[in-house]
Amino acid sequence: HHDIGKISNPSFFTENQLSEQNPHDNITSKESVEIIKQHVLDGVKLAKNAGVPERIIEFIKTHHGTNLIGYFYNKEAKLDPEIKKVDFRYDGPKPFSVEMALVMMCDSVEAATKSLDKPDNDKIDSFVETIIDKQVEDQQFENCELTFKNISIIKSVLKEKLKNIYHIRVSYSDGSN
């Protein structure tokens, strides 16, 4: 349910782009950010109209927290070093339960992993660590009861599941399978 708002502008989201054409190429980074942020508001509206329970709607609201929309921020920062990060952040709120934080981590890692070229054990391990560490550093989980032990376990599970998805097998030193 967390991404149902993408249905309002599907072609602006990578997972729905079936051709080489990217509509973001024809608009400014600031316009792109507004469209991307809008999927959260559209999702909330669609969910409310469909009678989705408020508890689920809270997950829609928090699944990006106040994360930086890094691709467009970095693109714009090259053109204008005076830009403000706040203009390139989701509006929040940040997750306020462990379950909401888990959805944020899973969504971020899953989406970003799709961009990996030839994923292998090391790339997946590094990617999961980097993405979740950025969220921790950015204080995305400050409103929920999430421990460092929880985060470590979540990272391990995500790494294992992603390796299963990409069918990455353990390499045996003696050459046997």
Ranges and model annotations:
Residues 1-121, 125-128, 134-138:
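Divalent metal-dependent catalytic cores for phosphoryl transfer on phosphate-bearing substrates
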Residues 28, 106, 118-119, 123-177:
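Long, compositionally biased intrinsically disordered regions
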